[in-house]
Amino acid sequence: MDSIQQDRLSSLPDILLIMIISFLPLKECVRTSVLSKRWRYLCLETTNLSFKESDYVNPDITDAEYSRIVAYRSFFCSVDKWVSITQHQVVESFEICFSHLVGFEDKIDALIEYAVSTRVKNLVVDLSNPSWRSNGDISYRHFMYTLPKSVYSLTTLESLKIYGCKFDPSKFVNPVLLRSLSIGWVRLENLHSLLSKSPSLQSLSIKNCWGVDITSMAGQFRELVIEHSDFSYMQCAFELPRIHSFKYSGELFEFYFDVVNVIIPNVYLDFGEERVYDLQSQSSRISGEVISRIINDLRAAETLTVCPYILQVIPECEKPSDLLQPMETRHLVLRTKMHTKEFNGIILLLNNCPNLETLGFDILTPCPFSATSSDEGIDPKTYWMQKRTCKSLRKTLKVVVIRNFCGSSNELNVLRYLIRSASGAGDALERVELYVPNGMEESQAMVVFAKAEMLQRTSKHVQVLCAQLLKK
């Protein structure tokens, strides 16, 4: 930090400086104590406490049992020291992230009791293991910590995140201020009881849970996220009149939206956990009908993101063009492998988005293969050369974006079709953005950029831009 910046900060009162450093990670907050005498003790008054195993324990030593135990003890020694010197400070946010619980249950208990005693507004208890990838990674061999009873009576909570920790939602006494709830890596029963007591809840996230025993959900949620979770029942009805963002990832699960907004800003659907199949069957036709009905319920989505499985199955139902209703979608994102099995689904969605302004393709494989043989009557060489009229392509589509663009023949054929279909009638299409994946060899990237230049030369009224995809 240079002298000018220090002078500017020095002119601020302590209360503002404390507010500023409270937004920093705890380790960065502590480092401010060396700036000057005035800063020496300000970090002790931070209102946000976050103790993460990853900030203190070197992952390279986790293979050695003795070294690992020593590192964990050192972690809790540092945490205990910090808590002891800030006993009477105001704490608004408290976070503990620790994955190796055996032998340290009392330490976790003490930290959570400390957080409760400060009447925190935001509490994070994340005891999940970073190595877990699915619910199958958790077995009887994994110790599951039980949340202390004192948390249930904490009425100041506005945000609560519980991962890898046993708890009973029905035991919460009066969570009237709770606005954000995130639950993961746990058997989730009696959730309805907690939701019914939380009139202020606006954001709900359920990730990698099992035994979720709800058949209906109602509330004033603005955001609902459900990822890779197993429900006890086959159906669930949602009555969410104020929903702004809905994200579902996991196995095909039949859910209904009874009441929704006139416009839903964002909907994300990913049924990628369903089995890949080669031939159309009665099962795939039924799946297509279920997904089409779900999309119809969410047809007010302003931005809609779909997965390859959706693109493959929705054309397989009986009379798919009659089953799927016109949507209000203005921004459509297709997560695709650019396989011929997905082509009919792409056309079907384009035909049902008459107001489409932005069309995105997220290529899931770094370099999608180029199919050269026909697949169920679909020839990738000629499919996009056929006359297929989509109203939105001629009148409203302005921008096409492809991420992880590798210049495959399937990608180029789709682009040529879109540009050709958009020509004339006002030339609504203005720009095509192509993003080459990171890590591509320079020689291969040069070929991809050359293909983009060729596309530009054949597209008079459309600007074609090609760039490297930035790392997230």
Curated annotation (Swiss-Prot):
Keywords: Leucine-rich repeat, Repeat
Domain spans labelled F-box: 6-54
InterPro entries noted in UniProt: F-box-like_dom_sf, F-box_AtFBL13-like, F-box_dom, FBL60-like, LRR_At1g61320_AtMIF1, LRR_dom_sf
The LRR repeat ranges on this chain: 58-87, 135-164, 183-208, 225-250, 283-308, 338-363
Protein name: Putative F-box/LRR-repeat protein At5g54820
Natural source organism: Arabidopsis thaliana (Mouse-ear cress)
Lineage per the UniProt record: Eukaryota, Viridiplantae, Streptophyta, Embryophyta, Tracheophyta
